[in-house]
Amino acid sequence: MKESIRSKLENLVERLDEVNHLISDPEIINNQNKFRNLTKEHSQLTPVVETFNQFIQNQGDLQEAKDMIKSGDPDLKEMGQEELPELEKQQATLEAELQKMLLPKDPNDDANIFLEIRAGTGGDEAAIFAGDLFRMYSRYAETMRWQVEVINSQEGEHGGYKEIIARIIGDGAYSRLKFESGAHRVQRVPATETQGRVHTSAATVVIMPEAQDVEQIDLNPADLKVDTFRASGAGGQHVNKTDSAIRITHIPTGTVVECQDERSQHKNRARAMSLLASRIMDERQRIHDQEIAQERKSLVGSGDRSERIRTYNYPQGRVTDHRINLTLYKLDEIMQGGLQQVVDPLINEYQAEQLAALSEDSA
């Protein structure tokens, strides 16, 4: 293990000791914010320190096995030779685990998200595909026990959506889906195609972390144009009787958001403000990510929304993620919500990039 990494881990051991003392201090206990922040830090530090302690213990056992091999006693030498391979394997595993634990954590990883899907080239078929993608993400959310709330949608003429915006609420939603942003392409024979020809259509996906605190995003009320209008679509007797739908325009950036899913204008306004704040925060973060990606030549977290990231080929039953050259012949399974088969390799690739960067910084 590199000295710089070991030093970081030793500092974390000291910090955990300090946090242990602080959370038993009556003054801290009476301060809810401080106590909550410290208990959160305690829960983050504990697994790292426990793994580091295992690493140190294993290192001692490893040295002991080497000393046994060097000793003149044949029995001890044999015992040491038997133990050494397993101890070396454990040491390598623990070191790799510790390096992953030291990777910088994205502060938005635990956030809820806004999912935006827009039909691209391909007309009606693109809208149908946008609907298929929304169903895929909704089913994946179900498997993760997340909640999905539709904020706004514009249905396609022959099914699917020209645009749909949803909020996904659940632990780790952003950490799991943040690499889904980009252009998704589908190759298949549309239901309306009489000649059996394969058509190519596309939809764009945007994943944004929900702003934790709308007030933290500097939104000057003078920069906002708020319009109310009557909600359209299903809703029975309540439709078109009140101006409950909300449209907010952020004048400096030209960003426009709408929310008409709730019957209450107050609720629609709150949701629209949350979406607007998240979009503005996301745009700032995207520019930042692009700058870092250019420096690091990152494949996964590039922040480029126009990049074609994935192809869904129905005749071949194939899904290909172009960023990491991943091809899976499990299209039906993935479209039914088995998205972890794509998500996990993307996260692993991103962590590998981060580890490479950590090694460079520690060199």
From Swiss-Prot:
Compartment list? Cytoplasm
Any one Gene Ontology MF annotation carried by this entry is: translation release factor activity, codon specific
- PROSITE patterns linked: RF_PROK_I
> What are the annotated GO cellular component locations?
cytoplasm
Q: Which SUPFAM superfamilies match?
A: Release factor (SSF75620)
The record describes its post-translational modification as:
Methylated by PrmC. Methylation increases the termination efficiency of RF1.
Provide the protein name. Peptide chain release factor 1
Q: Which organism is it from?
A: Hydrogenovibrio crunogenus (strain DSM 25203 / XCL-2) (Thiomicrospira crunogena)
| This protein's encoding gene | prfA
Give the record's family classification: Belongs to the prokaryotic/mitochondrial release factor family.
